[in-house]
Amino acid sequence: MKITILSLFPSIITPFFENSIMKKVISKGIISCEVISIRNFSDDKHKRCDDIPYGGGAGMVLKAQPISAALDYVNARSKTTIFVSPSGLKYNQKLAYDLSKKDELVIICGRYEGLDQRIIDLYVDFEISVGDYVLSSGEVAALVIIDSVYRLLEGVINPNSLLEESFSCECGLLEYPHYTRPYEFKGLEVPNVLLSGHHEEIRKWRFMKSIEKTKKNRYDLYLKYLEMRGENDGFNKKN
């Protein structure tokens, strides 16, 4: 897979590719990454890439010209192009899996009030939000997508580990709690079932803990789990 990132501030992105795991994945040829400065494509003599919005309003908008030139340079129309934006499709594990099957991704990092809509209309395949909050940097959101995608590529992580992660099993539950040595820590002990060596009992315990954790932390996913099983939780509200 190749990932190309278009950014006003490449220095935010590049250190990520120097961390030990990512560097190893790149050296193996599993993934290649390129960070391109949008400013290099601006036709403004001062390399300015933003302007005031038509119709008025606060903040500045990223201009179409430099981003269009950068996208044409990387031949974005033949690749899967993403714009990270708080108004985009909410990101989830399924979308991460879908993106991991693509050969090439181009990610546009937003800034300021947003991006000229004509770039989205002309080039963008997916407008993606990483959550219901606003970031000052599209680069941070781009790194979330990159990190969630590359770890799904063959040869990066043991496939069995991926199957047990939150959001990854067919039932959509969160992952169960984990424990390691020592057995006792500040008065709290490891659940005895995990020391029993009884694999079926351990599996059942982990499954029940996944249900409990999902109900507590992600009630929306818990309701989806019940719906999938054809069940309900009585009055359809938290207990």
Swiss-Prot record:
Keywords: Cytoplasm, Methyltransferase, S-adenosyl-L-methionine, Transferase, tRNA processing. It is found in: Cytoplasm. It catalyses: guanosine(37) in tRNA + S-adenosyl-L-methionine = N(1)-methylguanosine(37) in tRNA + S-adenosyl-L-homocysteine + H(+). S-adenosyl-L-methionine binds at G110, V130, G131, D132, Y133, V134, L135. GO terms for biological process: tRNA N1-guanine methylation. Belongs to the RNA methyltransferase TrmD family. This is tRNA (guanine-N(1)-)-methyltransferase. It comes from Borrelia turicatae (strain 91E135). The gene is trmD.
